Every structure is written in C-alpha cells, then in structure tokens.
Amino acid sequence: MAALALTGNVAQVAAAVGKPEKWELKFGFIKLTDMVPLAVAYEKGYFEDEGLFVTLEAQANWKVLFDRVVSGELDGAHMLAPMPLGAATGVITKAEIISPFTLSYNGAAITVSNSVWEEMKKTVPMEGGKPKHPISAEALKPVLESYKKSGKQLNLGMTFPVGTHNYLLRYWLAAGGVNPGLYSPTDASGTVNAQAMLSVVPPPQMVPTMEAGTTAGYCVGEPWNQQAVTKGLGVPVLTSENLWPNGSDKVFGVTKAFADKNPNTTIRTVKALIRASAWLDANNNANRPEAVKIISRPAYVGADEKVIANSMTGTFEFEKGDKRPIPDFNKFFRGYYGMPYYSDAIWWTTQMRRWGHIPEQ
C-alpha cells in the first residue's frame, strides 16, 4: 500500500540486520482469527529468535487499539487495512502510521439474522437445492420494504468507520441498489440518505448484539460469522473474496516515529511475522489445525475450536449444514503475499472518497 509502505530509515537498513534497538515490546490485537500470525510468531518462538521479547495484549475495540499505538502505549498492532490511510488523511486521529507488513487477506463475511435471511431467501436463485452464492444485496429490498411499512430501520453492524468491514458492507449494499448512506462535513454518522443504518459494534459483540435484536446483520471477520451459524442465529450471505479477491484485510501497524527510531527492531518484527505467515499457509494449510488450537485460548480469540476451524481449515458454513470449500477464506502468505501493495491503498482510498470520508476539496 502506497501510504503504508516502509519509509525513512527502515527501508535503508542493510540486509544484515543489526541488534534490535528495543527488544521488550507490547503489541495489541483484536479478538479475531486473523490476529493469528502474531500468536504463531509468539508461540513458535519466532519473535525470540529475532531477539525480541513480545507481550501480546487484547484490546477492547479498534479505536482503543489505534489510540494506544498513537500514544506509544503499544509499540505496534494488528490493524484494519485502511487505518493507516485514515490516519494520514486525518479522517481519524491525525498520525503517521506505517505498515511494513500485511497480516491477512480475505477473511471477512456479511451475516444476516435468520428472520432477514428467510425473507431474502425467497428471491435468491437456487443451485443444486442450495442458495447460489455470492448473494446480492438486491435480495434485501423486500426486507427493507417490510421494515419501512412497520416503521422500523434495518440496522447493520460494522467494526470501525475507517475500516475494512464498513467499506465492504457499503460496497455490497450499493452494488445491490441499497443506499448505505454517506458521511459529510456536517454529519459524521455516515447515515445521510441511508436506506440501511450502519453502526459500530466491536467484533466479539457482533453475535450478542444481533441476538438481542439491536442489529439484523453485520460485516466482520472470523470467527464471529461462523459463531452465528453454530448458535443458530444467522446466515452468512457473502464472503469478502467474492467482493475483492485477495484484498488486504489486516496489517501490522507502527508509528513512523517508532520505525525511524527502531529500524532493526521493526525489520526483525517483520521477519518473525513472515515466518509465522508462511507457516500458516505451508503445505496446503497443514498447520492450520495447530494454529486453531493456539488461538482458541482465552488469551487470544477465546472461541470454540470447531467454530474457528470452520473457516481456518479451508471450509465455510453458510446455512447450517451448507459447508463449502473456500481454501483461501483466510490467506496469510500463499503466493508470497505480505508486501503492502500500492493498489490496495488506492482501492481503500477510493472507498473513503466514495462514502464521504475524504471530501472533494
């Protein structure tokens, strides 16, 4: 990503990396499956091999995580891919955040409640007795009409305004002819002219919030879509690679000041993350079951192993029993990915502009 590429001293350090300037580090993450490269780098000793002694700390939500990186309370973190761009443009807290490594690709889905799905399903084409995927948001139109007649709003959850899930959800809705609303200089809610109302919900709260009836669906990373299926509360209607194949989802972010002051530490961190990501995708995902066991622990994602394994081991369940092969639902390094791409930065920036986060002037 253009705005996320290595800058300053980090890019100039010679191939033979010197000793880390700072070796005791604290990295933050959100309880999502795609934090797994950090957990693997820690549990497999890859950080220690680089002379780094890392503490991994779960954060309450994306805003808290981002603010703690900016303040220096965290040395780096698992971040939503658009976050460094949002910081550079001042859409969120103005800061210089760089991303030397992309942690994950694909990995998100859009899930709706059972009641919404039952209405949508009436207009969804069938193939072999099962709904044909990907499912267009056009199937939401009868639901919107029903809500309108009863004087209700269709409320959908996303994880952060300048985030992967907000922009993917908006893209899907608009492609199906449903207006997700706009941000404006005088209205930061993102609901200007909206037919569906989008609001922020922390990832681990997506399922409880839908169960309570506060939202009727959401866009989030795993395992919170598969948990809705397992609990019999909802049905995923789209996975993110159907919108943007191999699109960046999470990055590892640090402040530019940290990278400039600690170039060897930054490079050694990336080396450990590359090893972890390569391990995750090696031999057609052969190591994924072990990775699932690691992140199912309460200190990491803290979800049931079977729920995490649904997506991490190459399959994805839509309606209960409708499990389909999606080997790249979670992708970390296959195809020598990991490098921040200019094209990704451009795509995310166009979404910021499209929905009003970046004004015309």
What is each of the regions a protein language model found here?
Residues M1-A2, V40, L168-Y171, T209, ...:
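Alpha-helical scaffold segments in soluble metabolic enzymes
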Residues H165-L168, P202, M206, W224, ...:
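Internal, well-ordered alpha-helical segments in soluble enzyme and binding-protein domains
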Residues I110-T111, V251-V254, F258-A259:
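Short glycine- and hydrophobic/aromatic-rich loop-to-beta-strand nucleating segment
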Residues M1-A14:
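N-terminal export signals
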Residues L32, Q59-K63, H78, F160-G163, ...:
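Soluble non-cytosolic domains of exported or imported proteins
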Residues A15-S199, T209-N246:
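Short, glycine-/small- and polar/acidic-enriched structural segments
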